[in-house]
Regions:
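Short, Lys/Arg-enriched N-terminal segments with co-localized hydrophobic residues
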Residues: 5-24
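Proteins enriched for Cys/Gly/acidic motifs involved in redox and nucleic-acid/cofactor modification
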Residues: 22-172
Length: 172
């Protein structure tokens, strides 16, 4: 069995480290949900953990009927997996969200989601300062991307947030 036949993901290594586009080599599963066949674009910023988290999110979405796209202009859902390790990374993440939110004025883009460290750390201020955001997903809950995207389409139109707190040392 090759990695590709098992649906394993691979990265485009010729892109800059801090911005990688991810590809999945598997066929999507059809679903009757209102979200099936939506096109998804994901931009990853930051560390290797974010790359892995992005791969897991994309695999989950694709396995539930979402179509992945290489360009944001053809996506109905745009996801930005952010970084907040340094001030420069936070600024880059915010600028990327703002740049990609411009696609909401196009005919295709319906939803913008921010995930990762920036949303985990600055969830309240992000929700207030970037009203274009439809969803927030913290760095501790990336496996909930499918539930978040579905809730954005089935919800009230308000910002959807799925943010888990890190466990406190005393709770472990």
């Amino acid at each position: 069995m090759t990695p590709f036949s098992s649906g394993v993901l691979f990265l485009s290594h010729h892109l800059p480290f801090y911005i990688s586009k991810l590809f999945i080599m598997s066929n999507p599963v059809s679903e009757s949900s209102s979200c099936s066949k939506k096109r998804v674009y994901l931009e990853t910023l930051g560390c290797s953990k974010n790359r892995v988290d992005s791969e897991i999110m994309l695999a989950s979405l694709q396995n539930h009927g979402y179509e992945l796209t290489m360009t944001p202009d053809s996506a109905e859902v745009i996801i930005v997996n952010t970084c907040a390790f340094l001030t420069e990374a936070s600024d880059k993440s915010i600028n990327m969200i703002l740049d990609l939110s411009d696609f909401k004025s196009s005919d295709n883009c319906e939803k913008i989601v921010a995930t990762g460290c920036l949303t985990q750390r600055y969830q309240d201020s992000l929700a207030e300062q970037i009203p274009e955001l439809d969803g927030l997903l913290g760095s501790n809950g990336f496996e909930q991307i499918l539930e978040l995207v579905r809730s954005m389409y089935e919800g009230s139109g308000h910002l959807q947030a799925f943010l888990k707190q890190k466990p406190h040392l005393q709770a472990i």
